[in-house]
Amino acid sequence: MESRREKNPMTEEESDGLIAARRIQRLSLHLSPSLTPSPSLPLVQTETCSARSKKLDVNGEALSLYMRGKHIDIQEKIFDFFNSRPDLQTPIEISKDDHRELCMNQLIGLVREAGVRPFRYVADDPEKYFAIMEAVGSVDMSLGIKMGVQYSLWGGSVINLGTKKHRDKYFDGIDNLDYTGCFAMTELHHGSNVQGLQTTATFDPLKDEFVIDTPNDGAIKWWIGNAAVHGKFATVFARLILPTHDSKGVSDMGVHAFIVPIRDMKTHQTLPGVEIQDCGHKVGLNGVDNGALRFRSVRIPRDNLLNRFGDVSRDGTYTSSLPTINKRFGATLGELVGGRVGLAYASVGVLKISATIAIRYSLLRQQFGPPKQPEVSILDYQSQQHKLMPMLASTYAYHFATVYLVEKYSEMKKTHDEQLVADVHALSAGLKSYVTSYTAKALSVCREACGGHGYAAVNRFGSLRNDHDIFQTFEGDNTVLLQQVAADLLKRYKEKFQGGTLTVTWSYLRESMNTYLSQPNPVTARWEGEDHLRDPKFQLDAFRYRTSRLLQNVAARLQKHSKTLGGFGAWNRCLNHLLTLAESHIETVILAKFIEAVKNCPDPSAKAALKLACDLYALDRIWKDIGTYRNVDYVAPNKAKAIHKLTEYLSFQVRNVAKELVDAFELPDHVTRAPIAMQSDAYSQYTQVVGF
Amino acid sequence: MESRREKNPMTEEESDGLIAARRIQRLSLHLSPSLTPSPSLPLVQTETCSARSKKLDVNGEALSLYMRGKHIDIQEKIFDFFNSRPDLQTPIEISKDDHRELCMNQLIGLVREAGVRPFRYVADDPEKYFAIMEAVGSVDMSLGIKMGVQYSLWGGSVINLGTKKHRDKYFDGIDNLDYTGCFAMTELHHGSNVQGLQTTATFDPLKDEFVIDTPNDGAIKWWIGNAAVHGKFATVFARLILPTHDSKGVSDMGVHAFIVPIRDMKTHQTLPGVEIQDCGHKVGLNGVDNGALRFRSVRIPRDNLLNRFGDVSRDGTYTSSLPTINKRFGATLGELVGGRVGLAYASVGVLKISATIAIRYSLLRQQFGPPKQPEVSILDYQSQQHKLMPMLASTYAYHFATVYLVEKYSEMKKTHDEQLVADVHALSAGLKSYVTSYTAKALSVCREACGGHGYAAVNRFGSLRNDHDIFQTFEGDNTVLLQQVAADLLKRYKEKFQGGTLTVTWSYLRESMNTYLSQPNPVTARWEGEDHLRDPKFQLDAFRYRTSRLLQNVAARLQKHSKTLGGFGAWNRCLNHLLTLAESHIETVILAKFIEAVKNCPDPSAKAALKLACDLYALDRIWKDIGTYRNVDYVAPNKAKAIHKLTEYLSFQVRNVAKELVDAFELPDHVTRAPIAMQSDAYSQYTQVVGF
Ligand SMILES: Cc1cc2nc3c(=O)[nH]c(=O)nc-3n(C[C@H](O)[C@H](O)[C@H](O)COP(=O)(O)OP(=O)(O)OC[C@H]3O[C@@H](n4cnc5c(N)ncnc54)[C@H](O)[C@@H]3O)c2cc1C
Ligand SMILES: Cc1cc2nc3c(=O)[nH]c(=O)nc-3n(C[C@H](O)[C@H](O)[C@H](O)COP(=O)(O)OP(=O)(O)OC[C@H]3O[C@@H](n4cnc5c(N)ncnc54)[C@H](O)[C@@H]3O)c2cc1C
């Protein structure tokens, strides 16, 4: 409830109880909702909201042109292909086993029939790869993830962690799906803490082989996509154990990646020593066959070590260009950041679909109304605007932020610039976790905002929520990823004080730290005019101020607590604070990108619509955290009140262009699919679906 | 993110950047999460959280004795019955059609084999009825709802809206499931706004019959439970149309309820004139067969009018003990409040199961740890405590509040006391909406808190969330119900000013209004000692202050806006504010009940544990709304900070008795069922489930 909480109404005008009371009884009359003793019809007249202010006339074409991705052609090709193949569309109800087969067939259809070959783009044109992923994800999210497992995880591990010999041997088979494969990192006992993995790969110099073993049940590889049914290979992450000539006899070289064949190329039988079980029914993504793998002395040739960052020679000597176990492991994991970029990007895609369905239906749906007048659209209720309009604004905000992330990632893949690598790493961790957490909550809000009809499976919220849910966990758990963002900020904070340079995205910290460490300006704290509150400078300053102060304070707290609690204890004592810092930072980055996008929009009316959304995004976030701002007198009480009023007003304004803003996502009916959100005759399409 | 937001850290000690920075780098080293370049092993030592303070020794038996419901015997009988009948247990994966058949068989088994007869308790012993509902709901939520449709909705409408002739004719058949039935109120176009229903029941004096008609597609009865497959009858809500002798020819007497046979008693064929379609696959509750009904001149005898509140004589004359259409409709709907009480109560049951699974697993699961020390339980992370401990405290809070609601409801059913009717009506609307919204969000938090293993269907969060989701919507949409609570408060506010009496639950408004309308006390606003913050008087005062102020202010705002916008417009302009008021009020009622429950607990150690939870509930809510309190200087900046610190500390304290608090719910493993939450050998039970 806190998000709707009126944090400030107490400063609202004082009441004259008696007069009010009389009127109140009459007011409450208009409300005659379900299952309640219902008073008589109201007598009071009303003016409906939508008549309240002049509506902005948005050039929809210009807006969608501005929003449109570069790779719309391949996306449309994908939509057309699946549209032409009803046999490849996922029905509303399907068993797990059938769903898995269908999903595999969808992938085969995409690659072998539609001729879309995602693998080549994984390395060479990531923007295109992500566009493909977004499109197939909206066909069925399971397909998006299945494709990601095959090309980005299994394929990606081979080309990014292996060397030329691996590429030569596996590229074509992975590309054309002859070599289906898995990415086997997680174990039953270790997910987030990958350094704790226990599977071993022991070098046997006699036979020139590695022996893969699962030392105990906790080390069973778990959740491995493609393992339960379709995979022929797995990239297995295991501790490399080398024989030594000292008393210990062996040496643990840390976690490395190995290609392990798990099923016979011809018979598809599980290979000897490999035990595969099915992880079973999941909350969602049941088109993906996640399995659990146990290895009993499975032998693989030495060549199957993915040896880009570390190699073992014929005689068992270890070589690497990188000095330490941790550097090597870091480099290994660093190559996999693309998965996270993809999830952030795909999550915005889900948010777009969900917001579109909820908003289109809320425009159509009417319920209650002023006495003796037609019922009103539920989107005219202030509460419905509160549920959906900041969400619509946020969708735009995240759109621009993730497009930027994808660009940066592509650039990084080309230049391998070190600064950029660090930047993309933290940005992808932050955006992935922030956006997926938001979308997960938004999906529930959308379902609820559509009432009973939102609960029909055909209207999509259920499967979208169930499929998307795990975006918060895989490719790095959100709570863990945010800590990486916080750690990165602290590192840069330190650099700043040592006079180092700060990278592009974060540079505001450098510029602003000094300003923000001083007390808030008591004069501007009182400015409450709309022009001021809608000034990007005020908004950005407020976000940056908050981040800078959070950073400075947590640094001090960490320092204090580490004296008594040690590093681990101090970090834990400040953990909520650190997570807040990370989120605050990400919100700041998102706002900066949104402001830039508004500025660069060439069409004036489109720009005006974006500006409304951007202001709503900014002020809604400030209002949500008004306690922080009030507590240090960054805003005075009346300014807080003005921010709240303006937020409600902007929600109402955005409602007036909601249709245009949603249309600009250019999601055709065959992508949104929910009958209640069809662009024409929604009700009759809905009744048809159930058989009338 | 707002809930974790550090609203106050800026007042934390100022930093010495340089020293801090050096330490920070070391601190950040301990963090080596998945898929990221991971730094070297940390060197700093740590003290784990759980060693920080002395643990309270809770007498678990005393605590569970205090928590235990009166009707544990019948609940155990139900559990035992289903335990002994594996054929009646719902498998993880099941098709919609099979699920519906199974669900019907579960109900038949319960009634005819286990001999549990819920129908007699609907009217005579509601507490027992709700206990049965809770127990069957934890077997399968679909069964709980299916049972509710049969006995509380269909059966309840017959006995509560009908008269002796209906009871005599239908009681036994409903009781023994020969007369399966539906409650057909909602239409495609009208859910919350039931006064807008369009189905008609026209009296035909020639044949002494009513003719039921669906005038247009928007009037198709929709979402009707039991209609798609099993129902033989439906209580249909339709506008009663009577012939008149004036020029209009007919008169619309408003919505009434009629018993309409929809399927043949022998052949089970749909009867002539009735068209039934299947609403299809839903987000959850797929064991319930919701259908859509269209009527084409379906004739029923005059006796089928449920005539308790209004009757039609042989010659078409209308009689009623109640004066107006609205009074009659109100009385009709008022009889159905039990469904809402049941949902609030059942929702707490779901929350208990979900919190139990998440907390038991969080105690077991270990991930990361201080350097060279064993990994720690994830419940030792401050962030995990933040996710789950206020939730555990809230579960206790809602437990006591809904137990109270059920008691009041039973009393009301016995006494029919008018004051109590009004009280129960508002309280059930408020608690139903507040608790179900909370539980819906909590289920997502629990899934996420359990990481990947929380996503295995077998661990329950998916089905619990999907099934529970609609609790927010049916039996009255939450956003609509909260408005009823607000309207009720405004009504009482008015009564107060007219010198009327306030009923029990709300009486604090009477007592406190005068105090709270004055300015906050600048002295107590600065008190920040733990004793003060944990004093129930401070906590209740803070909650009541907020509610009183919100009420007073919204009354004034409504008065102001109604001048220009009319009643409907003014209400809408203040809608967010009104919803906040309603929530604030409900939170206050919940806190008062919790404080009372702590006070009355006979065992000192159990009492101490409850006190921890109660303080956490109270302070967490105050902190969530700290902006409001700060803005009117109800709390000074340092007090705000103290509240935040104490909240984190209490989360940690509650964590230390989390096992005991969860155990006291007395949910046996065969009820929680999630392998990851088994009370012993959870991991090995989990591996067994997937086939190892
Ligand atoms: C559908 C699905 C598909 C998957 N596919 C693959 C795959 O193909 N290959 C593969 O290798 N893996 C795969 N995974 C595994 C996935 O990567 C892991 O689930 C993920 O890394 C999280 O690890 P975990 O589940 O062990 O959670 P844990 O690490 O056990 O986390 C559990 C909880 O503890 C909290 N927590 C943990 N550490 C900390 C900390 N330091 N501070 C605060 N809180 C903490 C987390 O926030 C989380 O809420 C898949 C998982 C699923 C569910
Ligand atoms: C699984 C299931 C089982 C059901 N079983 C039955 C049954 O057996 N019998 C039966 O008769 N019905 C049944 N229903 C219908 C149920 O009672 C309705 O769905 C419910 O009353 C809500 O109505 P609605 O769906 O039309 O939502 P709407 O009233 O259309 O509401 C849609 C949205 O608009 C918002 N809204 C509406 N009015 C206002 C307002 N005044 N102010 C602010 N916001 C507003 C709501 O908050 C909601 O978010 C069932 C529904 C489902 C999904």
UniProtKB/Swiss-Prot annotation, chains A, B:
One example of a Gene Ontology biological process annotation: fatty acid beta-oxidation using acyl-CoA oxidase
EC number(s) per entry: 1.3.3.6
Catalytic reactions of this protein: a 2,3-saturated acyl-CoA + O2 = a (2E)-enoyl-CoA + H2O2
Residues involved in FAD binding: 186, 192, 225, 365, 384, 452, 473, 477
CDD domains to which the protein is assigned, alphabetical: AXO
GO terms, molecular function: acyl-CoA oxidase activity; FAD binding; fatty acid binding
Cofactor(s), names only, from the UniProt record: FAD
Broad class of enzyme this protein falls into: oxidoreductase
Gene3D superfamilies with a match to the protein in the record: Butyryl-CoA Dehydrogenase, subunit A, domain 2, Butyryl-CoA Dehydrogenase, subunit A, domain 3
Chief place of localization: other
Cofactor-binding details, from the entry: Binds 1 FAD per subunit.
Gene Ontology CC terms: peroxisome
Magnesium among keywords: no
Keyword Flavoprotein: yes
Keywords: FAD, Fatty acid metabolism, Flavoprotein, Lipid metabolism, Oxidoreductase, Peroxisome, Transit peptide
Subcellular location: Peroxisome
Role played: Catalyzes the desaturation of long-chain acyl-CoAs to 2-trans-enoyl-CoAs. Active on substrates longer than C14 and mostly with C18-CoA. Activity on long-chain mono-unsaturated substrates is double than with the corresponding saturated substrates.
Family of the protein in this entry: Belongs to the acyl-CoA oxidase family.
Classification via PANTHER family: ACYL-COENZYME A OXIDASE, ELECTRON TRANSPORT OXIDOREDUCTASE
Protein name: Acyl-coenzyme A oxidase 2, peroxisomal
This protein's encoding gene: ACX2
